[in-house]
A protein has these predicted regions:
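A contiguous, mid-protein "functional segment" used to position or interact
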Residues: 310-336
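Active-site phosphate/pyrophosphate-binding segments
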Residues: 3-40, 135-137, 143-270, 333-361
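Glycine-rich phosphate-binding loops that contact phosphosugars or nucleotide phosphates
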Residues: 25-28, 37-193, 228, 263-264, ...
Length: 361
């Protein structure tokens, strides 16, 4: 059996290298100086991986672009926040690689009706969400197909969204004067260098992830992934990849919130991944790590190459994804449960109606 998920993960360093320059050019095309300076508050939204990318890039927009930013899931934004947007300076980025997710389309549409300037990060200018916004940032980086036609958990699409968000944050920062031209170039070079960091992380983490998958193969209960700041987005994303790849119950949690909630969970040896960038999150991660050990958790920290926290999701997500890929292969578990048991990939997500849900005006 070919490990298609692992094969996709192995392509991520080259993907970063391939899209870095064209995505920077795309950000430059959309965000001119006047547009960038007009941003009073930025809202980023999406569903699933796209929502996690919004969370993972929030720090970049605040730190590099100097823009107050809120990352929200599409349901919350569309049905609750869109009615109360600022009357001036609201800019809204909807993230949807497929471009067909109803709730995200609804969110940017409702924001536009209320005077916000709207954007889509999507795979082409012809997707449904592209038709619903004023500006389109195209991320032409589809998941690698395979001859077997297997639906594989998405990693390339997530990385493409992150790269476009990071490129946009840097360029907006330069246009607003939050970054000098020299500083912007330094940050672009730092972002490009994550390709090497990702490759080094794969080399370090792949054997360890495989060994961990073998050692925990009989474990049948929850898996927990913890992170903070950008890596809270990573934690949510990695839990999603576990669910998709293996079907195991998995959750992403903020490091601080773990101490308030999962600390009291009954089961002792729960595999608990601590995903730390070693910067703003470092002191609290160390405290919580001690608490995890004290109550018998199986604390997991797979090896990775260091990376600035603002771009850490491009590196930190790789080791847990490799673990999920290896576990699925060892279990012989079909991705997405093969869309069986009442699940369906047809008709816009089957009964879940991801793409056919009724849209609110």
């Amino acid at each position: 059996m070919t490990n298609y998920f692992r094969e996709q993960i192995l392509t991520l360093p080259q993907l970063i290298a391939d899209v870095h320059a064209p995505f920077a050019a795309e950000a430059e095309r959309i965000f001119d100086a006047d547009t960038s300076r007009s941003i009073g508050r930025l809202f980023t939204l999406g569903c699933g991986d796209s929502y996690f990318a919004a969370i993972a890039s929030e720090l970049a927009f605040e730190m590099l672009a100097g823009v107050p930013t809120e990352a929200q899931n599409a349901m919350t934004f569309s049905r609750y926040s869109a009615d109360f947007l600022p009357t001036q300076g609201a800019h809204v980025i909807g993230i949807s690689v497929s471009g067909g997710v109803t709730r995200t389309i609804e969110g940017v549409t409702r924001a536009g009706k209320r005077g916000a300037r709207t954007y889509a990060i999507t795979s082409s200018e012809t997707t449904p969400i592209a038709q619903a916004v004023q500006h389109v940032l195209t991320t032409k980086a589809p998941d690698v197909p395979n001859a077997a036609g297997v639906q594989v958990p998405g990693a390339r699409s997530y990385f493409a969204s992150l790269m476009m968000l990071y490129a946009s944050a840097i360029h907006i920062g330069e246009m607003r004067g939050a970054l000098s031209a020299a500083d912007a170039q330094t940050w672009r070079a730092t972002l490009a260098a994550t390709a090497d960091a990702a490759a080094q992380t794969i080399a370090l983490a792949d054997p360890a992830a495989h060994s961990l998958a073998q050692d925990t193969l009989s474990y049948k209960d929850d898996f927990v992934f913890c992170g903070a700041g950008p890596n809270f987005g990573t934690a949510l994303f990695c839990a999603a990849k576990m669910l998709e790849a293996t079907g195991d119950a998995a959750m992403g949690q903020d490091i601080e919130e773990w101490a308030h909630l999962q600390y009291f969970a009954r089961l002792g040896p729960t595999p608990t991944f601590v995903i730390s960038a070693g910067e703003r999150d470092a002191s609290r991660a160390e405290e919580v790590r001690t608490a995890m050990h004290a109550i018998g958790r199986l604390v997991v920290e797979l090896p990775q190459t260091s990376c600035p926290e603002v771009f850490a999701p491009l590196v930190s997500s790789i080791p847990p994804m490799l673990f999920a890929a290896h576990r699925a292969e060892l279990l012989g578990e079909p991705y997405f449960r093969g869309f069986a048991g009442g699940r369906s990939i047809e008709h816009g997500g089957g009964i879940s109606r991801i793409r056919t849900s009724v849209m609110k005006a």
